[in-house]
Amino acid sequence: MPGVVGLITKLPRHRAEPELLRMVEALRHESFYVTGMWIDESLGLYLGWVARKNSFSDGMPLRNEQRDVVLVFSGEEFPEAGTIRHLKQRGHELNVVGPSYLVHLYEEDPSFPAGLNGRFQGLAADRARETVTLFNDRFGMHRIYYHESRESFYFAAEAKAILAVRPELRRADPQGLGEFVACGCVMENRTLFEGIKVLPPASAWVFQHGALMRKGTYFDPHEWENQIPLEPESYYQELRKVFSQNLTRYFDGQERLGMSLTGGLDSRMIMAWLKPSPRSLPCYTFGDGGGRRQCRDVVVAQQVASACEQIHEVIPVGEEFLSRFSHYAERTVYLSDGCVDLTHSPDLYLNERARQIAPVRMTGNYGSEVLRRSVAFKPGMPVAGLFSPDFLPHIHAAGQTYAGLLQGHPVSFAVFRQAPWHHYGLLALEETQLSLRSPYLDNDLVRTVFRAPKSALGDDVCLRLIADGDAVLRQIRTDRGLNGSRRSLSAVAHRGVLEFFFKAEYAYDSGMPQWAARIDYLLSPFHPERLFLGWHKFHHFRVWYRDTLSGYVREMLLDPRTLSRPYLERRQLEAMVEGHLKGNRNYTAEIHKVLTLELIHRLFLDSK
């Protein structure tokens, strides 16, 4: 995703500046990106940045009135009301809109960036103090990769920028690779690459004279964990107050904003309290372009948009995406630095189209994880015989690491571990195309949720919040039939049917057991997939890999380069590919993983 990039070094300028140029170019992915550089030899700072044109972060660098502080900021910040007015009263010169106030917050607030609210990364160069401070948000969602060498400290929003100037780092880290196979992400601020790490959440690392002096942290999760729990009613009232008061911050700004609606609760809570004027907020939903049926997300989202008097459209995944799958597969892995597998390749396609509607996408992301403590990832063991015995210990170790992470506070797991490790990859991919917003990582909201009693962790709080904001929206069933206001027999039966198809679709697609795959193969002339697919999901990779994408799967996975990877067992991989393409076996998850690993090799590890 767009962000800061560069090096802090004692190297002479004629050596450091060419490296900076290559690092910036490594992040220039789109024609709507803008780039810049700022160099201060006295500080040993060679700084670059990439931003989407007209986004909050466009227009860097920021300077104070004395021009002895330079700040470069990437991401978005959602300040308290009155912040800019207060700074003007203090005598600062700044624009009413945009990020110019941030450099003055740095001057005024000794704890900067502790007071910032949002997902961000940045760097402050202070000539008066002769310091450089590299910082990120308290959740670590706007990731900064780094590498420490003997002569330089490299940092970048994407790992590929560091690989561009330090090719010796194009080596897979076995522990990171094992975690990616087992959990779908790399944990504990490691990466897939040896020698490249991730800046921990809430970092403020200070450099002087080209050298790292202090690895500072401006926030400790215990500050929120050690709060006194609230009683159920007090918690609800506080949650309602914070959510309703802070929500409008996330709709500020000069760019056009689109609402990404789903059939669930979290985007509906936003609509219930935003109360947009008629036809003022473009709404859209990602849907299945296969022509079978409108998925439940689309059906429910259309009802919500209609109730709010907003225009709604469907962005489908269909033949256009499938015809260019190899392009989107490669770009998904490349743009995310291998942090997501090919399950999310449709998301790149969809967000390209969403940008055409609006360059800012409002979502309900992270609502279920924060408010209802949903666990979005866990370790899983691969099919026996696919990976070599030498590599299996790294996969097993991932499960032990994960188990240790669950020992702390469940909200801390959700926002300080699950969010920056598991959710980061999709966020990074989507933000290559547009600015993604969600009110569910708001500082005040998350702080409040840490005080939730155990009785307030289900759907009831969210349903009540919707009803208090807009009683009409409460009446609309969710994509899975949930509606807290109606307990009739017909409502229960309706929800049961939707739950059946929700689970049946998973079982008929990527989750199909091997015995069922053999039956499906015998019934294939009758196309039983038409009965089950398209109810809840807009992608159907088991069938796609078997049919439309079979040539791509065969070409990639039976290629001698793939079969020769030392951690793979060749014969088992060949048997899996042939079984899946024939149709009497289901290895969707394994094909996802091995295809992604192979693309990581070809794009990052084999490339020099």
Task: Identify the role of each PLM range.
Residues 1-7, 41, 164, 195-196, ...:
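Adenosyl-5′-phosphate
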Residues 98-102, 117-120, 174, 298, ...:
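Conserved glycosyltransferase catalytic-site signature
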Residues 252-254, 354-358:
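Glycine-rich phosphate-binding loop signature in dinucleotide/nucleotide-binding domains
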Residues 266, 366-367:
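Catalytic metal-binding/acid-base residues of hydrolase active sites
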Residues 224-233, 257, 283-288, 331-336, ...:
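Glycine- and acidic
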Residues 287-350, 368-386, 403, 410, ...:
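ATP-dependent adenylate-handling ligase core
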Residues 257-259, 360-363:
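Short glycine-rich phosphate-binding loop at a beta-alpha junction
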Residues 1-320, 328-329, 595, 601-603:
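Cysteine-centered catalytic environments shared across enzyme families
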